[in-house]
């Protein structure tokens, strides 16, 4: 088969860049999108011996499934690197689909991406690298950064005891994905590379176009892979949870209507309530035991504190006393100042903390992550209880 101009361009570029560089072995997670594709290409350019790895998570279409598998395989062929597909459907079903379903049934609003990062993606990638023995590192296309602990010496962070590796926000604040990575361990950080961490999104697209990557003009995915597969989160919920009729009740006690399951609601929700009231009403809380959706005026949605459970300290040792943090309680929201207090009267005092906000926050949602920062350093995070 005759080589296209793009084939020759890639071949010449990477062969010339690898002649003088020492080879290191790395596994790159490939979804078939432009970010992971460019990550692989940049690592080849930098002299790594790269192998692409794609996890088959769900049957059917989606960036993590059929189309993504084809694009990832084609990219590896273009780059002249090996490509491996792992069937991870069973672990994804157990660790993400099942736990997401259980969380909705409890009246929480879960964070499937964080579940997947902790228990599927990085776990599967690291295990694969370890089993190959000669592969020392893994990489993904996340917009986040990793630094050695010495980096913190340049900052005013004397109140923290830092671990060997620090997780930082991505340089592009509009694309920063560190919020979803709060559950990573030091073992993972010590072997992890984020090739796009210092880049802006527009630079990513330009670089991919310059290199002639087949995914360079592929539209960016805006949804969870669950949403891409099922069409919407609503359809996912309908498929996995049986409807159960209950009441929609104003916090003053007045019954305003009925619903077909608390799994269809989230704290702060206004649309889709199907009730009549002179003023706009919002979901205030969900009572799983009584199967009641409580609604209230917007002013009633504010909370000054929250209990955070299952806290993982990524970049610092567990604090033994209260600390001042910048807390981010949902993706895309701005961090807010707060005080974090260890709770010693819980069964597991090392993972449960009280977060007191400097200013009251609206729609603090159980099941979402509260992630703690000091400037650009991600200290740790946990689940809002």
UniProtKB/Swiss-Prot annotation:
Pfam families: tRNA_Me_trans, tRNA_Me_trans_C, tRNA_Me_trans_M
Entry annotation: catalytic residues: 116, 225
Example GO biological process: tRNA wobble position uridine thiolation
Superkingdom as given in the UniProt entry: Bacteria
Top-level EC class as recorded in UniProt: transferase
CDD domains recorded: MnmA_TRMU-like (cd01998)
Region Interaction with tRNA: start-end pairs: 175-177, 330-331
Site (Interaction with tRNA): residue numbering on this chain: 142, 368
Annotated positions binding ATP: 29-36, 55, 141
One Gene Ontology cellular component: cytoplasm
Keyword Metal-binding: no
EC number: 2.8.1.13
Disulphide bridges, residue numbers: 116-225
InterPro entries registered for this protein in UniProt: MnmA-like, MnmA-like_C, MnmA-like_central, MnmA-like_central_sf, Rossmann-like_a/b/a_fold
Keyword entries, A-Z: ATP-binding, Cytoplasm, Disulfide bond, Nucleotide-binding, RNA-binding, Transferase, tRNA processing, tRNA-binding
Flavoprotein in keyword set: no
Sequence similarity: Belongs to the MnmA/TRMU family.
Full protein name: tRNA-specific 2-thiouridylase MnmA
Source organism per UniProt: Prochlorococcus marinus (strain MIT 9301)
């Amino acid at each position: 088969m005759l080589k296209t101009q793009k084939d020759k361009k890639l071949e010449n570029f990477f062969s010339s860049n690898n002649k003088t560089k020492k080879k290191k072995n790395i596994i790159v997670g490939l979804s078939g999108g432009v970010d992971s594709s460019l990550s692989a290409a940049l690592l080849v350019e930098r002299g790594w011996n790269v192998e692409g790895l794609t996890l088959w998570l769900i049957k059917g279409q989606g960036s993590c499934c059929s189309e993504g598998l084809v694009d990832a395989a084609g990219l590896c062929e273009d780059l002249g690197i090996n490509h491996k597909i792992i069937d991870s459907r069973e672990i994804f079903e157990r660790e993400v689909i099942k736990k997401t379903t259980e969380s909705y049934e409890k009246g929480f609003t879960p964070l499937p991406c964080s579940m997947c990062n902790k228990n599927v993606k990085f776990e599967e990638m690291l295990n694969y690298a370890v089993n190959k023995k000669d592969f020392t590192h893994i990489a993904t296309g996340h917009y986040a950064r990793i630094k050695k602990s010495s980096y913190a010496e340049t900052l005013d962070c004397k109140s923290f005891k830092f671990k060997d590796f620090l997780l930082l926000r991505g340089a592009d604040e509009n694309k920063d994905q560190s919020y979803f990575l709060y559950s990573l361990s030091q073992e993972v950080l010590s072997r992890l590379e984020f090739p796009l961490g210092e880049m802006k999104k527009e630079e990513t697209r330009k670089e991919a176009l310059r290199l002639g990557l087949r995914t360079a003009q592929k539209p960016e995915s805006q949804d969870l892979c669950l949403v891409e597969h099922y069409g919407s989160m609503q359809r996912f919920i309908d498929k996995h949870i049986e409807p159960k009729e209950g009441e929609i009740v104003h916090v003053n006690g007045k019954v305003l209507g009925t619903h077909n399951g608390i799994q269809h609601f989230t704290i702060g929700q206004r649309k889709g309530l199907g009730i009549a009231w002179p003023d706009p009403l919002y979901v205030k809380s969900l009572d799983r035991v009584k199967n009641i959706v409580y609604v209230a005026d917007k002013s009633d949605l504010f909370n000054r504190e929250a209990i955070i459970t299952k806290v993982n300290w990524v970049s610092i040792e567990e604090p033994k006393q209260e600390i001042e943090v910048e807390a981010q309680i949902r993706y895309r929201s701005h961090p807010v100042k707060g005080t974090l207090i260890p709770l010693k009267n819980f069964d597991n005092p090392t993972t449960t903390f009280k977060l007191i906000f400097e200013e009251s926050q609206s729609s603090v949602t159980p099941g979402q992550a509260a992630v703690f920062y000091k400037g650009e350093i991600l200290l740790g995070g946990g689940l809002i209880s």
